[in-house]
Amino acid sequence: MLPQALEDAVKVAWVLCYSALLLVALAAAPQQRALQTPKEHTTRTRVVLLGTGTPVPDPERSGPATAIVVDNSAYLVDFGPGVMRRAKAAVLDRHIAALEPGNLKVAFATHLHSDHTAGYSDLIFTGWTAGRRTPLEVYGPTGLHSMTEHLLQAYRIDIETRTNPEGDQRSNPDGWKVNSHEIKSGVIYRDANVIVTAFPTKHAMESYGYRFDTPDRSVVISGDTSPTEETINACHGCDVLIHEARAVEMFAKLPEDRRSFGAKNHTTSEQLAALATKAKPGLLIVYHAWISWWPSVEAAGDQPVVLTSGGLHSTPDVLQREIGSRYSGNFVIGRDLDVY
């Protein structure tokens, strides 16, 4: 048995050793100013990331779709592939009843690229068959009327079958209808919960970002865009800014034609850090980023499986590092079904 003094010295040595190892581990860990797991939500207004992905299919990330939920009402921004399945997942996994498919009645499109709108028919018809009894109200840029009319025409047989008063598969007569509203900048929507203001963004077609002012929060979402003063002005100290980004490391590896397109129509991590420094949001959420939690290339027998289509994905830690080295504010790299 060790003398008491020696035993005490050994205990002290173990404590000092453990503390030193802990400090080394903390120093080696990536510096993250943001919460990687959203805290329990206590405000009336919640931001729900239904889809944070890109045009490239990724089993972890649905197409772009974000819900602003105020009390028991939900407002959808964009409706990429998988939107209604993700909405139901938010009901089951996050207990947000406002996102029941039949409850989705108001939506906003930032622009009409297919990766942001491929879930439009799903929003219309799944919401209808799930119980929506009033026309869907959808706001967006020029071309929304035409897209809506063509979708309804494409599903005419389904509509006629489900609304036939003598048929066996009857649904309510109004839930399939859509009131589409083509917008310009300014206040475009208001109700008892929210005022929605559209502002122009810079992308390959007519595009808008949106600011939501609710009783307790202000939320701005960019959609696809290169950095703009309009986005900075729309936020101007907002509670939450949701903005797209691409890692500089990945961007530099793209072919020249894609770099040229990206420079005009998207935002790099460095640019986003500079924009957020000026806009001063309480929380910056990075979404629609060309990243993947899956390896870029995996072996499948003798054939490689590539997640991208003629391009590259970065990893979340690269984007985290690039933004964190230039931005001192609170930020997160968003994942599907995160709630803030």
Descriptions of predicted regions:
Residues L22, Q31-V220, T231, A299, ...:
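Binuclear metal-dependent hydrolase catalytic cores
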Residues L16-A25:
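Bacterial N-terminal signal peptides
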Residues V10-A13, D115, H243:
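Residue-level micro-sites within transmembrane alpha helices that shape
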